[in-house]
From Swiss-Prot:
It comes from Gibberella moniliformis (strain M3125 / FGSC 7600) (Maize ear and stalk rot fungus). Gene3D superfamilies: 3.40.50.360, Cytochrome P450, NADPH-cytochrome p450 Reductase, Chain A, domain 3, Nucleotide-binding domain of ferredoxin-NADP reductase (FNR) module, Translation factors. The lineage of its organism: Eukaryota, Fungi, Dikarya, Ascomycota, Pezizomycotina. The gene is FUM6. This is Bifunctional cytochrome P450/NADPH--P450 reductase. Residues 1-16 have a biased composition (Polar residues). PROSITE patterns: CYTOCHROME_P450, FAD_FR, FLAVODOXIN_LIKE.
């Protein structure tokens, strides 16, 4: 900070009565004020002394005196270049032994500085810096790939990584030299970087100690400093010599210094000046930016709301693209974050100026010519007269354009002043914006909760011991990131597909249809709330056409009332929901049951049922009912009913394909039309669609979906638990929902998977693909005869992450080369297929990447995939709470599966604690939702809830709500509805009791502030359970909601006897466990009160009013 040997105390005239002596702490003999501040927290100490002695004060070191300035107003005076000029004092003066008379260390009056300044400054103009973007991005990608390959559990030393990044960047951009810091063994720093840190630290230490201490006590440190200074200059001279011997045609800094002439004098830089300035840029150009980036990541982690906003801005601007130089200017909030970081933690402690003549400062303090005055950034940048009472707080909003432009002079001076301002400012800001944007675009940051900020002040200010962890976003793996950074260009492709949904017929009221040979046609009917049965229906239609059948219709089951086709086989695909028909079959089932025997003579049918084993009592109930009722009414069964258990360990597509291959089609008469496949043969997709390039369309393939705009997206949980998120939507005008209703969303594949697919088929993001129907095939919801970008096609229409079916595997076997065929064949063995493909959720894309000699075109790939189906979520808001808006509360599904040997290599897997290699998988819909930020849009459709899952009309009756995790969503909506109804209401509201379970009060206790407010006004009483912190006061020792229900048995019983309604929302296991606790208790109460004669809980539930005990269960 000070140059003790350079400056000596001079007498200051105080004969003018208006002048005052500059205050300051009293110095000690010889040592001066050495003990008045903490060298480990120097800038803060200087600020504290300013609070004691005023905005300008003097401190003494041995025989030299320096003046400190801590106010913006006085700093503005010192920045008047007609009165003061920069003084390269303190550590900069010591650094002259290393960098000589470089731009930062030379006096302004030095002719060497003037020539170098005129030659070098134009090299850092805006357009020149833009031209350096690709080199900057190259190094940043190296860092990101290194982080990704270390995995999410590796603590990253932020300062070390930022130093590697900035050193390698400045070297590549200015002299086309690669230090390759990220490739060094064991992550060690490059010796050049180590030497830079050492000489800067030593320069600072020397500048703050008396000469006798440096020369006689610290002689070893002084000797090391001289050796390292000589070594740095030697290495720089070697770089220059190498360029002279091997000239390159590059318009970079080194070539300019070697050949450019000063426009004023016509002189070039001397060999010594070239070394001085090149070394100056290599040192100053990386240390300061490294400090900026390190503190930036610290502040982002300390302020999660800021981190979220920056990440959302990056996502909005960049989207699924790779970052380009044009993106950088569209991130004003990120730029504001960097400005605010520089305000609070400038990389430099400040800078020196000296008066050009004897001066009076602040109207009353005399300073002599050449007297060092030091502007303390840490104080000037926190001046409350400029920044207000919150000047010490990190608030980037103050640095957005309007606020930044209105700052008074000298309120923000991190890059210095006037003619001596840092010429590398555009370079540093472009590099910093790129680095932060790329990191946040690719990673989520994980804070080290144990870290407390410590920083070290030398010539720069750096955080000490600061680490963080990073987690690839969107479920990406390191290989995916690498492919995304270097994906290929566009190419022609071909794809097999079929007519769009719009071209498919609906059922006609004429059951006999036209004169077409009905035996060569089939009709497919489906009923599904989640979309699974609909996807299977279109899969069957495509498979049938592959075998030569025509498709008479693909329609919902309800549309078959009074119009079931006669003559054409009718295939019905449906599911049960708590024993009830899906929405699309609710009218059909009563109609079918009402028919007389023989009414459906001449109808041929087959039924396929979806179900989930957790609903054991009603598993396949509706499909079996339809199957038996059709037979009762005289219809002829052409195949035994097929079923698929859709629990986690089973795949409905594999079950379905097995059924149609082994049961259905062998019983049907196959016409073997053009391109048809004989029964018993596997249908192998062929390249029968022509694909050409064209303009990208915007096509909506479904009815009933409308566009909603995201207005808020935030995390509700802390790291260490599955993430819970909140999403607020702006809805279209006519979208009228009720509390408890559901919304269907149309998700998209993760950018990671889209990039993988694009890379595999060699497609660019904007490659235009047109799928044409050349063989009258049916599609899986693919757009036909319309140009569409490859990104849209692979992102929005087919599920890339869907587990491969056995039929898919056989297709790959047929397309595989000799090297892969045996390995793929082994996976078709039933046990291996289940254990290594199904249970581990291995996708077709996984298999294609693992076995590169599979010759599969896009035309074969697309028909193998299931269409993307909608997913359902409960609204977590009441419609009148914020009119025109709705909120969703959801868990981001992110889980690990064991890596399959031979499929997931080391680059795609990671090792957990016991050494087991695992692959991270993400839920399609929840990952898609988590990628959305404010301003983005999605397509939604309203789905009404069960008429019983709502609050009773009588507000005086009690209600008991039981939920875990995001099962709280509908209850939040009910409570908002109850809160608004209570405003001004005269009627009495019955008690409301909410049992809510989560992992812990500081982990994922959702909407805790809102619920506490409701409790305060008596709207509800919340009984909590924490699985990870049952000892918390409000959990009362309960880990799960079932524990809390047992503990509150008397309270629950009292409300039940008063007519309470019980609403349960959560996973199937939780709902079952709750019934195991409440069922016997409530049954016993009703038995004693004579309200039931049931003997068992099952019997009691069956007889109970459906509105008294209602479950909303999700899988």
């Amino acid at each position: 900070m000070s140059a003790t040997a350079l400056f000596t105390r001079r007498s200051v005239s105080t004969s003018n009565p208006e002048l005052r002596p500059i205050p300051g702490p009293k110095p000690l003999p010889l040592l001066g004020n050495l003990f008045d501040f903490d060298f480990d927290n120097l800038t803060k100490s200087l600020g504290e002394l300013g609070k004691i002695h005023g905005p300008i004060y003097s401190i003494t070191f041995g025989a030299s005196t320096e003046i400190m300035v801590t106010s913006r107003e006085i700093a503005q005076e010192l920045c008047d270049e007609t009165r003061f000029c920069k003084l390269p004092g303190g550590a900069l003066d010591v650094m002259k032994a290393v960098v000589g008379d470089g731009l930062f260390t030379a006096e302004t009056s030095n002719p060497k500085w003037a020539i170098a300044h005129r030659i070098i400054t134009p090299l850092f103009g805006a357009m020149r810096i833009r031209g350096m973007f690709d080199d900057m991005k190259d190094i940043c990608e190296q860092m990101c790939l290194r982080w990704a390959r270390f995995g999410p559990d590796e603590p990253l030393n932020v300062c070390d990584n930022m130093t590697k990044l900035t050193l390698d960047t400045i070297a590549l951009c200015t002299i086309d030299y690669r230090f390759n810091s990220f490739y060094r063994e064991n992550g060690a720093a490059h010796p050049f970087a180590e030497a830079v840190v050492d000489v800067m630290t030593e320069s600072f230490d020397q500048s703050n100690l008396p000469d006798f201490v440096n020369n006689y006590v610290r002689f070893r440190a002084m000797a090391k400093f001289k050796r390292q200074a000589a070594e740095l200059r030697r290495q720089t001279e070697e770089l220059i010599a190498a360029r002279r011997q091997n000239p390159v045609d590059r318009d970079d800094l080194l070539n300019a210094m070697l050949s450019a002439k000063d426009p004023k004098t016509g002189e070039g830089l001397s060999p010594e000046s070239i070394v001085d300035n090149l070394l100056t840029f290599l040192i100053a150009g990386h240390e300061t930016t490294s400090s900026l980036l390190s503190f930036c990541f610290y502040y982002l982690l300390e302020n999660p709301h800021v981190l979220r906003r920056v990440q959302q801005e990056v996502d909005t601007v960049v989207g699924s693209d790779t970052i380009t130089v044009d993106h950088l200017s569209s991130m004003p909030y990120l730029e504001a974050v960097l400005r605010e970081t520089l305000r609070l933690r400038d990389p430099g402690p400040g800078f020196y100026v000296k008066p050009l003549k004897d001066e009076v400062v602040a109207g009353k303090y005399a300073v002599n010519k050449d007297q060092p005055l030091f502007i303390v950034f840490d104080s000037v940048h926190r001046d409350q007269s400029t920044y207000g009472a919150d000047a010490d707080e990190f608030r980037p909003e103050r640095m957005l354009k309007d606020g930044f432009d209105k700052l008074p002079p000298c309120a923000w001076k991190p890059f210095g002043n006037g003619v001596r301002a840092c010429v590398g400012r555009p370079f540093a800001m472009q590099q910093a914006i790129l680095a932060v944007a790329m990191v946040l675009h690719k990673f989520d940051l994980v804070k080290d909760e144990s870290y407390t900020l410590k920083y070290h002040v030398t010539m720069t200010v750096r955080p000490v011991g600061f680490t963080m962890k990073v987690r690839l976003r969107q479920g990406q793996r390191a290989t995916d990131l690498a492919m995304g950074l270097h994906r290929g260009h566009s190419q022609e492709a071909s794809a097999a597909a079929s007519p769009s949904r719009a071209s498919l017929k609906r059922l006609s009221s004429d059951v006999n249809g036209d004169d077409t040979d009905h035996k060569s046609q089939i009709a497919v009917l489906y009923a599904s709330n989640s979309g699974s049965c609909e996807a299977l229906a279109y899969r069957l239609a495509a498979e049938a056409t592959e075998r030569g059948f025509g498709i008479r219709a693909v329609d919902v089951v309800n549309n078959a009332i009074d119009r079931i086709p006669v003559g054409s086989p009718v295939i019905l695909i449906t599911a049960s929901y708590n024993g009830e028909p899906a929405d699309d079959a609710q009218e059909f089932v009563p109609w079918l049951k009402s028919l007389e025997s023989g009414r459906l003579n001449g109808v041929k049918f087959a039924v396929f049922g979806n179900g989930h084993r957790d609903w054991a009592n009603t598993l396949f109930a509706v499909p079996r009912l339809i199957d038996s009722e059709l037979a009762r009414c005289g219809a002829e069964r052409v195949s035994l009913m097929g079923v698929s258990d859709t629990c986690d360990s089973s795949d409905p597509f594999s079950d379905f394909e097995r059924w149609i291959d082994e049961k259905l089609f062998p019983e049907l008469e196959t016409p073997h039309g053009p391109g048809g496949v004989k029964n018993g043969d596997r249908a192998v997709p062929r390249q029968e669609l022509q694909v050409s390039l064209g303009q990208p369309p915007r096509i909506t393939m479904r009815k009933g979906y409308v566009r909603a705009i995201v207005t808020e997206a935030r995390s509700l949980s802390s790291p260490g638990v599955p993430e819970k998120r909140h999403l607020e939507l702006l809805l279209p005008k006519d979208f009228n929902y009720k509390a408890g209703d559901h919304v269907y969303i149309l998700p998209r594949n993760s950018p990671r998977d889209v990039v993988r697919a694009l890379s595999y088929f060699g497609l660019g993001e904007d490659t235009l693909i047109t799928i044409r129907n050349t063989a009258r095939k049916l599609s899986l919801g693919l757009p036909l005869d319309t140009p569409i970008t490859a990104t849209d096609l692979l992102g929005a229409y087919v599920e890339l992450g869907r587990t491969a079916s056995l039929k898919n595997l056989w297709t790959l076997v047929d397309a595989a080369g000799h090297g892969s065929r045996a390995a793929l064949l082994s996976l078709t063995e039933p046990e291996r297929f289940r254990a290594e493909v199904q249970d581990r959720h291995v996708s077709i894309l996984d298999l294609l990447e693992r076995f590169p000699d599979i010759d599969l075109s896009l035309s074969c790939f697309l028909p193998m995939l299931a269409q993307i189906r909608p997913r359902a979520y409960s609204f977590s808001s009441a419609p009148d709470w914020k009119p025109g808006h709705a909120t969703l509360t959801y868990t981001v599904v992110d889980f690990a599966t064991p890596a399959t040997q031979g499929i997931n290599g080391s680059s795609k897997s990671k090792a957990v604690g016991d050494g087991t290699a695992v692959v991270q998988r993400q839920g399609l819909a929840s990952s898609y939702l988590s990628s959305l930020g404010p301003g983005t849009s999605l397509y939604v459709s309203l789905h009404r809830a069960s008429p019983y899952f709502c609050l009773q009309k009588s507000t005086s009756l009690p209600v008991i709500m039981v939920g875990a995790g995001t099962g709280l969503a509908p209850f939040r909506a009910f409570l908002q509805e109850r809160r608004m109804a209570a405003e001004g209401a005269k009627q009495r509201f019955g008690p409301a009791l909410l049992f809510f379970g989560c992992r812990g009060p500081r982990l994922d206790s959702l909407y805790s502030v809102e619920l506490e407010a409701y409790e305060t006004i008596g709207l509800v009483q919340v009984r909590r359970a924490y699985s990870r912190d049952p000892s918390a006061q409000d959990a009362q020792g309960c880990k799960y909601v079932t524990d809390r229900l047992g503990k509150c048995r008397d309270e629950v019983a009292r409300l039940w006897m008063d007519g309470a309604q019980v609403l349960v929302c959560g996973g199937k296991k939780m709902a079952n466990d709750v019934l195991e606790v409440l069922g016997p208790m409530l049954l016993e109460i009703d038995q004693k009160r004579g309200e039931t004669t049931a003997k068992t809980v099952v019997e009691w539930r069956a007889r109970l009013d459906k509105s008294r005990y209602v479950e909303e269960v999700y899988v």
